Amino acid sequence: MIDILRTPDERFANLPGYDFKPNYTDELAGYEGLRCHYLDMGPKDAANTFFCLHGQPTWSYLYRKMIPTLLASGARVVAPDFFGFGRSDKPVDDAVYTYEFHRNMLVELVGDLDLSNITLVCQDWGGLLGLTLPMEMPNRFKRLLVMNTAFGTGDLPLGDGFVAWRQWCRDNPDMAVGKLMGRSC
C-alpha cells in the first residue's frame, strides 16, 4: 500500500464559485486504495462529454467558471483531480509521480466512467497527459479544446525554463497557489 496524505474535505468548504458535489473512486484498476476525486455533472447519457484536465499547480477548481457554460449546452462535464492535487489523495513518495502513473489513471477513469463522445479540454500538464488519450481510445474522443500546453514527443530535452520551474516547485513545497494564480487574473 502506498503511503498517502488526504486533505480533509472541510478544507474545500466555501471556496468561491466551487460549490460542486465531489465524487470519489478508490477502485481504479492499478490504483486500488487511492482515492481519486472528480467532478461529474450533467446527464450521464448526454450527447457530448467535456473531459477537463488541469495542469500544475492547479486542480479541477481551475474550471469552475467554464463548467456552468459547458453544462448549459446540455453536456456532461467530468473534471478529475490528478493524484497529488486538489481533493485526490497525495502519495508521499515523490517517486510515485511518473508520467505513466498520471496517464494510466486517466485511461482507467475514462473506462470506469464509460465516457464517450468526449471533448478533451486540456491545459498545461493536462495536455501533456491528455493529448495521448485520443490515440489510444479513438472511439471515445471526438474533439479537442487545447489551451496553454505542449505535445511532448520525447525527442527534445526539456527547456531551461521548464527545468527551472520544476526545481522551484521542489524547493517551495508550500507554494501559495492562490497568490500565484492571482497574478494572472
What are these regions (language model features)?
Residues 1-22, 36, 41-44, 49, ...:
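Flexible "cap/lid" subdomain of the alpha/beta-hydrolase fold that forms the substrate-access gate
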